[in-house]
């Protein structure tokens, strides 16, 4: 989705396809270790699945690009720093063509919720 970009060692890149229905957020996440997509039924479950994926792969950065024809609606999540269950990174929002920076998991969740309310 994006061109060349400097990425800190140990960072992680994922893609999120989200659906909001009746105040419920569901979707699939894609990336290293989840190439076929991991479904989730809530944002809290998404966070737990992302934690598990990052724990199992360790600090090895694996570039992953979505396959040709992948949905243009997917959000691109880049977790640049992760320590003590806190994340910092950026989320690219395709519908509005912007990038949001977050300094905690809570801030990431608020960005996602606000994106779907707008």
Give, region by region, the residue ranges found by the protein language model.
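Intrinsic disorder/low-complexity detector
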Residues: 1-23, 48-85, 117-118
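Mixed-charge, glycine-accented linear interaction segment located at domain edges/termini
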Residues: 31-38, 47-50, 91-118
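Short aromatic-glycine-(Arg/Gly/Cys) micro-motifs in beta-strand/loop hairpins
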Residues: 18-34, 82-96
């Amino acid at each position: 989705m994006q061109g060349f970009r400097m990425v800190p060692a140990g960072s992680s890149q994922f893609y999120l396809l989200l659906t909001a229905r009746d105040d419920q957020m569901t979707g699939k996440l894609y990336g290293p270790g989840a190439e076929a997509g991991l479904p989730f039924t809530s944002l809290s479950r998404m966070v737990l699945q992302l934690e598990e994926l990052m724990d199992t792969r360790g600090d090895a950065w694996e570039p992953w690009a979505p396959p040709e024809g992948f949905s243009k609606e997917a959000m691109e999540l880049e977790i640049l720093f992760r320590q003590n269950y806190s994340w910092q990174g950026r989320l690219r929002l395709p519908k509005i063509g912007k990038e949001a920076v977050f300094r905690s998991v809570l801030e990431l969740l608020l960005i996602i919720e606000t994106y779907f309310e707008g």
